[in-house]
A protein has these predicted regions:
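Positively charged n-region of N-terminal signal peptides that target proteins for export
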Residues: 1-4
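Bacterial N-terminal signal peptides
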Residues: 9-21
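Extracytoplasmic copper-binding redox domains, predominantly the cupredoxin/blue-copper superfamily
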Residues: 24-267
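Intrinsically disordered, low-complexity segments enriched in glycine/proline and serine/threonine
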Residues: 6-7, 262
Length: 267
């Protein structure tokens, strides 16, 4: 009996060794390096467009005595630039798509967050906390198409993201509402925080190309050398007067209560 148990244990150990040597890196596990970065806007903070919400008195009432602006440039101390999408370019081993949905909220007649990241195949979960109805409308070039009304205190809207792109989401009822979803095919992405920082963990070692994207200033890329178990730092800077690159989206909100005019550059 003892001999049989020993053989069984040896077989189990052998199988575990084979599995460990054939499996690729998995997000959330060790073996990779960490990329820590900072995104800055190097100049005076641009003036964000003023939003006129008179077309919906219920939205307008939320901002009595205030001057709401579009959160196009969210710049903090030392030029820290928030809401910049960060992702790694290239091909990576398959990893499980999270079963937890990414959440886009409608609150105070604005989308929140302004920019978020998600995996292809992940579920988008849109909620409405406002005292008014919304119409959630995607402007997709890759088949992530939806256009649906969401009533006051209505059930969440859910959609399984199908393809990679930077997806712009608007509201047909409130033309000033905009959000961007960076849909990617790997787990190595982030969005810069209020202090301009971002972190991507468990990155496979080797040369990696980092792409950042801002809705007005467009994309930038840098290549870094990631080492297992170590931290790699990288900084990105946008300059005043820099010509927006392909992929930037320009918005112009004019002082009119009925409609907002947008100029959208091709992505």
């Amino acid at each position: 009996m003892i001999r049989k148990a020993t053989l069984s244990l040896a077989a189990i150990v052998a199988m575990l060794v084979v599995f460990a040597t054939t499996s690729g890196p998995v997000a959330g596990q060790g073996g990779g390096g960490t990329i820590v970065g900072h995104v800055r806007y190097m100049g005076p903070t641009p003036v964000n467009p003023l939003l006129r919400m008179g077309a919906d008195p219920r939205c307008n009432k939320l901002y009595v005595g205030k001057r709401p602006t579009a959160p196009t440039f969210v710049v903090g101390g030392d030029g820290a630039l928030a809401n910049v999408l960060v992702e790694l370019e290239g091909s990576f081993p398959d990893t499980p798509v999270p079963t937890t949905p990414v959440v886009l909220d409608q609150k105070d007649c604005m989308y929140a967050p302004r920019v978020l990241g998600a995996r292809i195949g992940q579920t988008l979960h849109v909620t409405n906390q406002d005292p008014t109805s919304h119409n959630i409308h995607s402007l997709s070039k890759s088949g992530n198409d939806f256009n649906t009304t969401q009533l006051i205190k209505g059930p969440p809207f859910e959609y399984k993201l199908k393809a990679g792109e930077i997806l712009r989401v608007t509201c047909d009822n409130h033309s000033w509402m905009t959000a961007y979803i960076g849909i990617v095919d790997n787990p190595y992405f982030a969005v810069s925080a209020a202090d301009g920082t971002f972190t991507i963990a468990n990155v496979p070692p080797g040369k990696q190309t980092i792409r950042v994207w801002h809705e007005v200033m467009g994309p930038q890329t840098q290549t870094v050398d990631v080492q297992a178990g170590k931290m790699t730092t990288v900084d990105f800077s946008y300059m005043p007067g820099q010509k927006p690159a392909a992929g930037a989206v320009r918005e112009l909100i004019v002082p009119a209560d009925v409609e907002a005019v947008r100029i959208v550059a091709s992505r």
